[in-house]
Curated annotation (Swiss-Prot):
Organism this protein belongs to: Chelativorans sp. (strain BNC1)
Keywords: Ribonucleoprotein, Ribosomal protein
Protein's name according to its UniProt entry: Large ribosomal subunit protein uL13
Keyword Ribosomal protein included in the entry's annotation: yes
Record GO biological process: negative regulation of translation; translation
CDD domains, per database record: Ribosomal_L13
SUPFAM superfamilies: Ribosomal protein L13
Protein function: This protein is one of the early assembly proteins of the 50S ribosomal subunit, although it is not seen to bind rRNA by itself. It is important during the early stages of 50S assembly.
Protein family (similarity comment): Belongs to the universal ribosomal protein uL13 family.
Domain of life: Bacteria
Molecular function (Gene Ontology), one example: mRNA binding
Pfam assignment, any one: Ribosomal_L13
Subunit structure comment from the entry: Part of the 50S ribosomal subunit.
C-alpha cells in the first residue's frame, strides 16, 4: 500500500467557530493550531495547507491558570539598541487589542516558514462575540466539552 499524499487541489476546508469565553489559553491554542495545520484529518500531509478556517470569538474572555495572568511576560524587540520591550498578559488583555494573546499563543505553536504563515491567515480572532463570517455557515466546536481541564470558572 502506498503512502497517501494530499494534493493541494483536492483539499476541502471547513469553517469552524470557537467561543473562547472561559477557556484556558494554552489548551485552546493547541487545539486551534492542530486544526489550522490539518492534523485532525486522516488526509494530513505535512507540506500541504490542509487545515480548516478557524474563527475565535470572545478572545478577551480567555483565562490563564495559576498566577500567569499577572506574572506571564511577553517580550519583543524594536530593532534598536536597548529596544527590548515587555508587557504582562494582564496589560495586553486589558489593553486595546486583547485578541493578540490568543493570536500569539497559536502563532507560536505553528511551524515558522511560508506554509506556517499561510496557515495563520486561516485564523480569525475577535475580542467580542460578533464576527463577519456568518455567510460561511461555520460549524460550532465546543472545546470545553472535549476535556474538563479546557475551561475554568
Amino acid at each position: 500500500m502506498k503512502t497517501f499524499s494530499q494534493k493541494p487541489a483536492e483539499v476541502t476546508k471547513k469553517w469552524v467557530l470557537i467561543d473562547a469565553e472561559g477557556l484556558v489559553v494554552g489548551r485552546l491554542a493547541t487545539i486551534v493550531a492542530n486544526r489550522l495545520r490539518g492534523k485532525h484529518k486522516p488526509t494530513f500531509t505535512p507540506h500541504v495547507d490542509d487545515g480548516d478556517n478557524v474563527i475565535i470569538i470572545n478572545a478577551d474572555k480567555v483565562v490563564f491558570t495559576g498566577k500567569k495572568y499577572q506574572d506571564k511576560t511577553y517580550y519583543w524587540h524594536t530593532g534598536y539598541a536597548g529596544g527590548i520591550k515587555e508587557r504582562t498578559a494582564r496589560q495586553i488583555l486589558e489593553g486595546r487589542f486583547p485578541e493578540r494573546v490568543v493570536e500569539k499563543a497559536v502563532e507560536r505553536m505553528i511551524p515558522r516558514g511560508p506554509l506556517g504563515r499561510r496557515q495563520m491567515k486561516n485564523l480569525r480572532v475577535y475580542a467580542g462575540s460578533e464576527h463577519p463570517h456568518s455567510a460561511q455557515n461555520p460549524e460550532k466546536v465546543d472545546i470545553a466539552a472535549l476535556n474538563k481541564k479546557n475551561a475554568r470558572g
